[in-house]
Amino acid sequence: MNKILFYFFFFLTLILSATVYLFGGPMMLFFINYKTDLLKVDDVYNHEIYSNQSAAIPKIIHQTWKTNEIPEKWVGAQKSCIDLHPDYEYVLWTDESMREFIATDYPWFLTQYDSYPYNIERADVVRYFILYKYGGIYLDLDVGCNRTLDPLLHYPAWVRRTSPSGISNNVMGFAKGHPFLLQVVRNLPRFAFNYHFPYLTVMYSTGPLFLSIIWSAWRKLPDAEAWHHIWVMVPELYEKSHHAFFEIYEGSSWHDSDAGFVFYMLHHWAIFTFLGFLTFFIVVYFIFGYALKPAARVSRTGRRVFSSPFSKTSPSRWKIFHRFTSSNEKYDQTRSDSLPFMSDYDLESQTQSHSP
């Protein structure tokens, strides 16, 4: 009995530990107070704090794709950003130029770069290195521009808030050599792990969840200078608003089938949390309320005696928990059968021996 309980709690501890390891960081994102981090509409058009300074972010727009030939569905998005920013440098990084960039400027990371199982992971990590070295604004190819991005250049570091919590890496602006990005690239090897589910692997190793966890730790550090602050763009500045800087086109489809289930869980997190706790309590109740419930035995005087499930004389409800009684604890079959309250107690189903 004690051994069974030990294994039960041992595996329960393993499951809980794995859950905390996988979801502890993301769950903490729900408790972040964004008030001091939000980049609001009024802030963008009233940047007196930077009025006497030049733009912190250089006028460079970075995008990535496999080759120089991007899909037709994103040509409009790309053209909108180029046309609105004739004085910006535009760079489209390809798979070939991205790997060459890592090999030349960050050779210590090349082995890790090549080892990622999914190409989207390489596209994720290279944007962090590019923005750290050159600065500028990174946009996914499915992000078009509604207006000039000049007002955003006065904020040394900005990202956008994502749902249900955390930040995204599909739209980012950083000054060259920003220390937050240095912290990001230094942590990439530590988070490089294959979870065997494409969506979880990408999100945790290089994607938005990874970036959100690093940002959550970063914002707890002493903010000595405003230059180190990471601004989080409110949804009104991102899309679907007359203040929005961007327009979202049809996105890429790197998500696998597991992503659909994860998205469903995120949208119904309260239900799944309730079901998780309910399952846990049902298992605990079944173990302690039924399988380990003290069972009745018959004493020599014919009385029903309830003993502890840990007792060697306790006939358990499960055969796996059964304890054989010693030879000196034999029951009187004749007397037991004559007792009315024993009519529903099948002694023959127990593995105890009886005297004739």
UniProtKB/Swiss-Prot annotation:
Task: Name the predominant localization.
Answer: endoplasmic reticulum
A Pfam family matched by this chain, by name? Answer: Gly_transf_sug
Q: What domain of life does the UniProt record list for this protein's source?
A: Eukaryota
**Transmembrane region positions?**
4-24, 197-217, 269-289
Residue positions, PTM Phosphoserine:
307, 353, 355
Mention one GO biological process in which this protein takes part, according to its record: mannosyl-inositol phosphorylceramide biosynthetic process
Gene Ontology MF terms in the entry: mannosyltransferase activity
Q: What EC designation does it have?
A: 2.4.-.-
Where is this chain's protein located in or outside the cell?
Endoplasmic reticulum membrane; Golgi apparatus, cis-Golgi network membrane; Golgi apparatus, trans-Golgi network membrane
* Record-stated family: Belongs to the glycosyltransferase 32 family.
Function as written in the Swiss-Prot or TrEMBL entry = With imt1 and imt2, is required for the synthesis of mannosylinositol phosphoceramide (MIPC). Catalyzes the addition of mannosyl to inositol phosphoceramide (IPC). MIPC is essential for cell morphology, cell-surface distribution of ergosterol, localization for plasma-membrane transporters, and lipid-raft-mediated endocytosis of plasma membrane proteins to the vacuole.
In its UniProt entry, what is this protein called?
Inositol phosphoceramide mannosyltransferase 3
What species does this protein belong to? Answer: Schizosaccharomyces pombe (strain 972 / ATCC 24843)
